[in-house]
Swiss-Prot record:
Protein name, per record: Chromatin modification-related protein EAF1
Subcellular location per the Swiss-Prot or TrEMBL entry: Nucleus
Superkingdom of source: Eukaryota
Domain HSA: 536-611
A single GO molecular function term of this UniProt record: protein kinase activity
Length: 1654
């Protein structure tokens, strides 16, 4: 160390830093993630990470500094901080391996983490953009705060900056999937002032920019190291995310000091020594990442070179690639100030430093640090990374003593490197630690590769998923599985399963038990010391020479490869030609089409050899004269008999002067190098003609000689070859032989191309466009080309001669990088072009030599020394098939048991294939950390040195034959083999007792399938089939199938398949002959049980005679136990049958409904029983409520009846006083009342006739009355309701007329009495007609009921005849009939009965709704006094009908009810019936008098009676809800309570009715408005008519004042009655339309939901 003071670094503490700036490591990680998302964000991140100068804290809060003078203290701080901040996933793995964390929790955590990462990425991206704006504005300003000379606390633009260009920049380059503008389009000006300032301070020459590296970095490793480098890079980036800013700057400072001072200056330093030198550890707060804070109180010193220092300092700076046409911008900041010492005071010069140190401290790994000492300029190489990567390739120290003992020679190390990795530790798999333990010889980073597959390497869930579970474990741990299977075996779960299990489920449990027993056996053998983990190597057998068959197979494989590749080549050519033709047709203009064409000379007609021979037989003399001059051409033609001669091979080069020149025979130049042009008008050249004739003659002779040697099968090939040669030479001949063509040879100058040999084999023909022609006169160039071509030939002797020993992999990667950037259609690669693209300085740096020394290594970088096999040593080179030499062809047969082939022995564990190595030998405490082996441990370094390719051989061994596995014998069609179903080639020997032998084995379906597969595959080679069958299944020594067993089983299966039957089972065990004779001697009187027992005993004895094995004995015992259990089961069944009582079986002759007893009670049936019990309790509650309500209603009706009687007496007294004053009006009123008789029908068709008061006179019913009776008799429910409504509307008119008559003068008393008598007679007649009508209706009802009963009896008879299906319409069955039914038939009967009851209830609900609508519709007008009684009578009829319909249901339902519930229900029904009878017996109430005008006349009453119904309805306000509606509501509640409808169905019905009511109410309101308008018009007209009538009556009274009132002409009562009946009939026909709505409820049927069957 120099005695001069070393400059220190001022690094602020992260604890006091504001949260605004983002650390460089975070920005670097953000750049890594955004590189996968968007290219724009990548460029911005790279531009941001170019800042290497740390921010200085604000002046208001000066930090406390601690001096650290030694760079080793900084290295110690960085090392400790890195080890402290590494992630430890043990806790996460332990949590995820338990049941506390579910898959949903992991998914939600992963989703939250991804969302947070996206937010952080967007935030960091915007901060990076603001920093980029700040940097672009202030990097070249010296006096502005924020420039490299005056760094502020924050290096970014404020978030609230409102400048327009800032907003537009942030908006253009925001983070998005569809960016509008890339960050590459943002051009940064070159920092010229900054470079000048740096050059002035460093006292160096002008700063130059180093050229950018090749597309693939100079440090691109080989294929074997690429994966390790990527994994290591990802791990470093993951750790950098959790580093602090101080640690990153400390690492950069350590690198800078290492560059200046050399590797010898950095010594290991402990944490204690570091603390003594000024390094302190920042206090760790909860949730804070630990970091080291290194600060200094001394100001930053600039780099000043010593007087005797001539070493150029390389200052790292970051640059950004602006565009492909722009240069690289310089760095915006420099590294911390470093004191540069003189080279004399440095112990280890940088020029003499090792290559590993240069690569470690270089910002761009791979570039040399040994620049020329005479250079005064400063070279700034591009460096996109602020924090350098950890040195990877370090010079290996000497081997550890233990390693030297274990590995005395490289051969043992190579053997250890080829071994497989050690198995993992089962006890440490749960926490994730120790995963892939002992993996020091991994051929690929197994653990890191699994982690690198995830999109985010920092994701805790990704790490946990990779380390936990079968998917991420990588290796199966049998011991762990064995422990878990013993703790919770699947067989126990299968045995207690409550669901249906398939055969595969049972097979899983069976296999698990087999494996558990196998593992238990292994553990037992381990305990006894009989289980070995070592397997001796197979002894190599004697050498087997190849036979003729082996050579024939090789030739067949070669032919197969040739044919397949030729077919692929033809398909490829056809593909390209088709696409080119399609492109030519798509071209629109001739110019575009001309670009697809190649301008060649016109082709000539091909002539056959025979024609040429006939034409030239006459010119043999002239041909002989020129034979001596055409010998070179003959030699060339003889050597190229089988080579196709293209136009380019027969063309020669042209002279420069362009003058014609003749071809002379004595010049010696080959004719194939002459470019001959045919011209009919030119003179013939005699020499050319002779040469052509000589060529034809030589070709014919060669063809005839070859045809004689070939057999008949080769004649076609000979003709084809001759045609090919003739096609190349016939272009020179045209015309008759007596007149040779005129040939003119023209020579024109061609440009001399640069020699460019192709990287291909000579045996592969190349086209003229790919290989440029070389002049024949240039002999040195041709020789060089021949040398290069032969050098690139892929021969077996050159397979191992690669440049890996002389040329490093980095240089190879750089050299072959341009190959990957070429087009996919390029087929020729020039080595010279590759060498020209290589940078000499980069090549010198990679080779570790000076640029001036590259001339000495020219032999390595010559075009002739490059080939594909040398540039790609790790890849096999595919080339043409070359003929092997006679002595190189191996005559040894491929040994199936060699070490290169996988053995046929069962692979139990990986320890059998690996050399045992104790873990303590590896020293895990020193060489293992954080679950993986350290890269710089002695074992890893030794393994890499001994075997860099990690077991991958460097090139294939050409002496060995190709690996087996050819597709030569693969069947390419789906047709079966011809001999698949034929007889066996060799039938095995039949045993002594084949049937007994076949009965010993039980074949499972899987075994049958496997046996048939083996038989088809090995063509009935039964010995091999039996061997394979026994070796691939777990069996005992006694359960071994012989060849005959396999043959017999296949034969039986084929016979069964031919007959269309399934595979047969084992045949029965034959009985011995002696026992059979004894059985035959016995009589047939024995029962079946005795004979079966005898047979079982005999089979047992015969079974015990076979071999006396334990398996036979166990089988016989099992059969005996099965026989006894079956016998015991039969005895128990017979005892149960005798105990049961005999019942009449109605299904004796029923063959279609043989159904067994019902299954056990299911949860659904239990819930149904519970529902029935709850419904019964609910019905009982409602019955009690109804009984109480009926009692209350009875009391109220009695009180109301008393009040009505008292009121009737008072009204009678009032009528008696005023009755004498209006006899005429009373008569008219009574007549009107008689005409408004109403016939009301119930819902079930029962008509209840409401009679008028007894004082009304009767009248004979005329034809109109009879018609009205018939119409009323035939009407249904809706017509009856409409008649009731009409009656209620007509009633106020009669009452008004009666009131007007009451107030008439007393002069008409006599007439009133007479009128009253007539009304009494009329009333009696009306009552008689109504009684007759009721009798007719009652008779019709009885007829309908009788018809229904007959139908029910018929259906019941059908059900009794065939009880397979119970009809819904049948009535209730008796207990005897139900007892005869089976349980399933009873269930079916109950379901159908419930459906029929539900249908009846729905019809009843519809009728009740119609009745409610009718009663409510008549509520708006005046009602008769006895309307309530009529409604109650109608409700009574409805209730009776409902009671009749529910009798069938109650028969079954009441059986399950308790006696108290039935009695309560009967009492409630009786009370309700009594209440209805009392309501019918109640007398009618008298009408109340109305105030009439004094001048009222009989005509006025008539006119008022003729008023429409709507006027009376609109004039009278609506009274409260009548008793009729209440009764109907009560009846509806009773019906719902007695029904089986659930609460949900009732609510649904109510909602449906409510919606329909709303819709219909709106329609009714609209209709009412229209009717009101029409009624108003009619009223106006009637009023005018009434006024006219009144005026006429007054005139008549004035003219006849003395005439008494009874003498007026009035219609007789019979006419009034007929008019009333006609009006009622018309109104009835009008009401046949849908009934009017009452609060939205219509007479239309509303179908409730179908009730559930009980």
């Amino acid at each position: 160390m120099s005695t001069e003071p070393v400059s220190s670094l001022a690094l602020p503490a992260p604890a006091i830093l504001p949260t605004t700036p983002i650390p460089a490591s975070t920005q670097q990680a953000s750049s890594l993630v955004s590189d996968q998302i968007q290219e724009a964000s990548t460029a911005s991140q790279k531009s941001v990470t170019s800042i290497t100068q740390p921010p200085i804290p604000s002046q208001q809060q000066p930090p406390q500094h601690i001096t650290a003078n030694h760079p080793a203290s900084i290295a110690a701080a960085a090392t400790v901080a890195l080890s402290a901040t590494l992630l430890n996933p043990n806790e996460w793995n332990a949590l995820a391996s338990t049941s506390m964390v579910t898959l949903d929790d992991l998914r939600s955590a992963f989703l939250e983490q991804r969302q947070q990462q996206l937010k952080d990425l967007e935030r960091s991206h915007r901060e990076s953009l603001r920093e980029m704006i700040f940097m672009s504005e202030n990097y070249d300003k010296e006096d502005v705060a924020g420039s490299p000379w005056k760094l502020g606390q924050s290096l970014q633009v404020a978030e609230d900056d409102a400048r327009e260009h800032v907003k537009s920049f942030l908006d253009q380059h925001r983070l998005a999937l569809d960016p509008k503008m890339s960050i590459k389009d943002h051009i940064l000006e070159q920092p010229k002032l900054l470079r000048q300032r740096v050059s002035q301070e460093l006292k160096t020459g002008p700063i130059e920019l180093a050229p950018p590296p090749t597309p693939t970095s100079a440090t691109a490793p080989s294929a074997g190291e690429a994966q390790r480098d990527r994994d290591l890079k990802r791990e470093i980036e993951q750790n950098n995310l959790h580093r602090s800013q101080a640690v990153a700057r400390a690492a950069a400072a350590v690198q800078a000091h290492a560059i200046a001072e050399g590797v010898a200056k950095i010594k290991p330093l402990t944490i204690t020594a570091a603390e003594s030198q000024g390094v302190r550890v920042a206090p760790l707060q909860p949730g804070q990442v630990p970091s080291f804070v290194i600060e200094s109180t001394t100001p930053i010193a600039h780099i000043v070179a010593s007087s005797d220092s001539s070493t150029a300092v390389l200052v790292a700076s970051d640059a950004q690639k602006v565009d492909s046409h722009t240069t690289m911008s310089a760095a915006e900041a420099v590294t911390p100030a470093i004191k540069v010492e003189s080279t004399d005071n440095i112990d280890a010069s940088p020029s003499k430093a090792s290559h590993a140190l240069e690569k470690a401290v270089s910002p761009v790994p791979g570039l040399a640090r040994n620049a020329s000492t005479q250079s005064t300029s400063l070279r700034v190489p591009p460096s996109p990374m602020v924090v350098p990567t950890i040195p990877e390739n370090i010079t290996a120290p000497p081997l550890h003593p233990t390693l030297q003992v274990l590995a005395p020679n490289p051969l043992s190390v190579t053997y250890a490197a080829s071994l497989r990795p050690l198995p993992p530790d089962p006890t440490r798999r749960i926490t994730g630690a120790g995963l892939s333990g002992g993996a020091i010889h991994h051929r690929s980073g197994r653990k890191i590769t699994s982690l690198s597959n995830h999109s985010n390497v920092n994701s805790y869930s990704s790490i946990a998923a990779a380390k936990i579970g079968p998917a991420g474990s990588g290796q199966a741990d049998l011991y762990r599985w064995y422990v878990r299977a013993r703790a919770s075996p699947g067989a126990g779960m299968v045995g207690k399963a409550d669901k249906c299990l398939m055969t595969s489920d049972w097979r899983v449990a069976f296999n698990e038990q087999r494996f558990v027993r196998a593992m238990a056996r292994i553990e037992k053998l381990k305990a006894q010391g009989e289980w070995s983990f070592r397997q001796p190597k197979k002894q190599k057998g004697p050498v087997v020479r190849k036979a003729h068959w082996d050579h024939l197979l090789e030739e067949m494989k070669w032919l197969q490869t040739d044919f397949r590749e030729e077919r692929r080549w033809k398909m490829t050519v056809a593909f390209h030609l088709a696409h080119e033709v399609a492109a030519w047709h798509r071209a629109r203009t001739p110019a575009e089409r001309a670009q697809f064409c190649v301008h060649v000379q016109r082709s000539y007609r091909h002539r056959t050899i025979s024609d040429n021979v006939e034409q030239h037989n006459t010119d043999k003399l002239s041909a002989k004269e020129v034979v001596s001059s055409s010998q070179p051409f003959q030699a060339a033609a003889a050597s190229l008999d089988d080579v196709e001669m293209t136009h380019s091979t027969s063309s020669s080069h042209i002279q420069k002067d362009g003058e014609p020149a003749t071809v002379k025979a004595e010049s010696g130049q080959p004719v194939e190098d002459a470019d001959v042009t045919m011209d009919g008008g030119a003179d013939a050249d005699e020499a050319v003609t002779q040469a052509v004739e000589s060529a034809l003659q030589t070709t014919n002779e060669a063809a005839s000689a070859r045809a004689e040697e070939m057999d008949a099968d080769g004649e076609d090939d000979a003709d084809t070859d001759a045609n090919d040669v003739e096609a190349a030479t016939a272009a020179l001949v045209s015309g008759e032989p007596s007149k040779p063509p005129k040939v003119e040879v023209v020579r024109e100058p061609l440009s001399q191309p640069q020699p460019m040999p192709t990287l291909a084999d000579v045996s592969v023909p190349t086209t003229s466009s790919a290989t440029p022609t070389v002049p024949a006169s240039s002999t040195p160039t041709t020789a060089a080309n021949d040398k290069l071509v032969h050098a690139l030939r892929s021969q077996p002797k050159d397979a191992d001669s690669t440049l890996t020993a002389e040329m490093p992999p980095q240089l190879l990667a750089t050299l072959r990088a341009p190959i990957f950037s070429t087009s996919v259609t390029t087929t020729v690669v020039s080595p010279a072009a590759l060498l020209d693209s290589l940078n000499p300085e980069a090549a010198a740096a990679l080779l570790g030599i000076e640029v001036s020394d590259l001339a000495n290594a020219a032999d390595l970088l010559e075009p002739g020394s490059l080939s594909f096999s040398k540039m790609f040593p790790e890849l096999p080179l595919y080339g043409g098939v070359s003929l092997p030499e006679s002595n190189s062809k191996s005559d040894r047969r491929w040994d199936e048991g060699s070490l290169n082939q996988p053995p046929r022995l069962t692979h139990v564990t990986k320890l059998l294939d690996s050399r045992p190595l104790l873990v303590s030998t590896l020293e895990p405490s020193k060489n293992r950390a954080n679950g993986r082996w350290l890269a710089d441990s002695d074992w890893v370094v030794a393994a890499e040195q001994s075997d860099p390719l990690r077991g991958v051989t460097d090139g294939a061994d050409t002496a060995l034959p190709p690996m087996p596995g050819s597709l030569l014998f693969a069947r390419k069609s789906n047709r079966a083999a011809k001999d698949a179903s034929g007889p066996a080639s060799t039938t095995p020997a039949e045993p002594a007792s084949p049937d007994a032998r076949a009965a010993l084995f039980v074949w499972t379906p899987d075994e049958d399938n496997y046996l048939m597969t083996l038989a088809k595959q090995y063509h009935n080679n039964w010995a091999l089939v039996a061997d394979l069958f026994n070796s691939t299944r777990l069996n005992t020594a006694t359960d071994k199938r012989e060849a005959w067993d396999c043959y017999d089983r296949c034969k039986r299966i084929e016979q069964a398949a031919a007959e269309g039957k399934p595979p047969p089972g084992p045949p029965p065990m034959p009985a011995p002959a002696a026992d059979a004779d004894k059985d035959s001697k016995k009589g047939d009187g024995k029962d079946a049980d005795a004979s079966s027992s005898k047979r079982d005993k005999l089979s047992k004895k015969s079974g015990s005679k076979h071999d006396g094995s334990k398996r036979k004995q166990r089988r016989s015992n099992l059969m005996e136990v099965m026989r006894r259990s079956a016998k015991r089961r039969e005895a128990t069944k017979q005892a149960q049958q005798t105990q049961q009582t005999k019942k009449v079986n109605l299904n004796t002759h029923e063959t279609h409904a043989q159904i067994k007893a019902g299954p056990a009670i299911t949860p659904q049936s239990l819930s149904a029983l519970k529902t029935e019990r709850d419904q019964a309790a609910l019905r009982q509650y409602y019955e009690q409520q109804r009984a109480q309500l009926a009692y209350q209603q009875q009391q109220q009706q009695q009180q109301r009846l008393l009040a009505q009687q008292a009121q009737a007496q008072r009204m009678a007294q009032q009528q008696g006083t005023a009755g004498t004053s209006a006899p005429a009006a009373t008569a008219v009123t009574q007549a009107g009342k008689a005409g408004t008789a109403i016939v009301a029908g119930g819902t079930g068709g029962v008509g209840n006739v409401s009679l008028l008061p007894a004082g009304t006179p009767a009248a004979s019913a005329g034809p109109a009355g009879q018609a009205q009776q018939k119409a009323a008799t035939g009407q249904g429910t809706n017509q009856a309701i409409a008649q009731q409504t009409q009656q209620q509307q007509q009633q106020p008119q009669s009452q008004q007329t009666a009131q007007m008559q009451v107030q008439q003068p007393p002069a008409a008393a006599a007439a009133a009495q007479q009128q009253q008598q007539q009304q009494v007679q009329l009333q009696s007649q009306l009552q008689a007609s109504q009684a007759a009508q009721m009798q007719n209706l009652y008779a019709q009802m009885q007829q309908q009921q009788q018809q229904q009963q007959r139908q029910q009896q018929q259906q019941l008879g059908q059900a009794a005849a065939g009880l397979a299906q119970v009809r819904p319409g049948v009535g209730a069955l008796t207990q005897q009939q139900l007892a005869t039914l089976t349980p399933q038939q009873q269930q079916q009967y109950h379901a159908q009965l419930a459906a029929a009851t539900a249908a009846a209830q729905q019809q009843q609900l519809r009728s009740q709704m119609a009745a409610v609508a009718a009663a409510q519709g008549g509520q708006a007008g005046f009602q008769l006094p006895n309307a309530q009684a009529q409604a109650q009578a109608q409700a009574q009829a409805q209730f009776q009908l409902m009671q009749q319909q529910q009798q069938q249901q109650n028969v079954m339902q009441n059986q399950g009810r308790p006696a108290m519930a039935q009695q309560a229900q009967q009492a409630a029904l009786q009370m309700y019936q009594q209440q209805q009878r009392q309501a019918q017996m109640r007398p009618p109430q008298p009408t109340q008098p109305f105030a009439a005008r004094p001048n009222a006349r009989p005509g006025t009453a008539a006119s008022s009676q003729a008023k429409p119904q709507a006027a009376a309805r609109s004039a009278t306000p609506a009274p409260p809800m009548p008793a009729t509606v209440q009764a109907l509501q009560q009846q509806l509640a009773i019906s719902l309570a007695t029904s089986n409808l659930s609460a949900e169905q009732i609510n649904g019905l109510a909602i449906q009715l409510y919606k329909q009511a709303q819709q219909q109410q709106q329609q009714q309101q609209q209709q009412q408005q229209q009717q009101q308008q029409q009624q108003q018009q009619q009223q106006q007209q009637q009023q005018q008519q009434q006024q006219q009538q009144q005026q006429q009556q007054q005139q008549q009274q004035q003219q006849q004042p003395q005439q008494p009132a009874p003498t007026q002409q009035r219609p007789p009562p019979q006419q009034l009655l007929n008019q009333a009946i006609q009006a009622l009939a018309a109104q009835t026909q009008k009401n046949q339309q849908p009934a009017p709505t009452v609060h939205g409820v219509t007479g239309s049927p509303v179908r409730p939901p179908t009730p559930r069957p009980s």
